[in-house]
Amino acid sequence: ITLCYQLKGDGTRAISQAKVGDKLSVLLPLGNGFDLGDAKKIAVIGGGVGVFPLAAVVDEYAGERQFTSYIGFRGIEYACLTKRFERAGKLIVSTDDGSMGFKGNAVQTFLSDYEEDKFDLIISCGPPVMLRALKTALKERKIPTRCLVSLEERMGCGIGACLVCVCKKTDGHNARVCKDGPVFEIGEVEL
């Protein structure tokens, strides 16, 4: 098992202080994953630490599916996993400051490269601002491609009881990201 995290609070700080050989207690698996269905041509749009779950998907299906990955970071010092995405298919990197790849973000690079019928499916994970931009762009440009997003939410219990990770759905109901997600159809959740 590989744990990837970004220092955000006491929990990730404690993980960062663990040493080789230390024992950690984990509760896995939680929620659902990306269901690629019959899709063969897949756009992967990731930002920041959101690239980690996407890398797992491209690793699992490399050779079986055609991936074009658009991944973005704040700057070159935050860039990671690029070789894994390259092994799985085409990779386009962007950074907010232009220190690596294109200057801009992953959604912008996807939109500049998009052609009708190029993809059967879009999968994405990243900060809420990125997912909102993607949802808006898909709607404004009338891009009909199915899009699945994995939400980054703070999770307490991991089993849906504490309600720390609740998100609003477009039907007016709530969803527990740890149990009902973290992967949702982009039109199913408020971002």
What residues fall within each predicted segment?
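Reductase modules of NAD(P)H-dependent flavoproteins
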Residues: 74-191
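Short glycine/serine/threonine-rich phosphate/pyrophosphate-binding segments
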Residues: 51-57, 130-131
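Short, Lys/Arg- and Gly-enriched loop/turn segments at beta-strand edges
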Residues: 31-40
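Conserved beta-strand elements of the Class I
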Residues: 42-45
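Ferredoxin-reductase
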Residues: 1-20
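Generic structural signal for buried aliphatic residues
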Residues: 23-27
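Loop/turn positions that initiate beta-strands
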Residues: 20-21, 162
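Conserved S-adenosyl-L-methionine
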Residues: 60-67
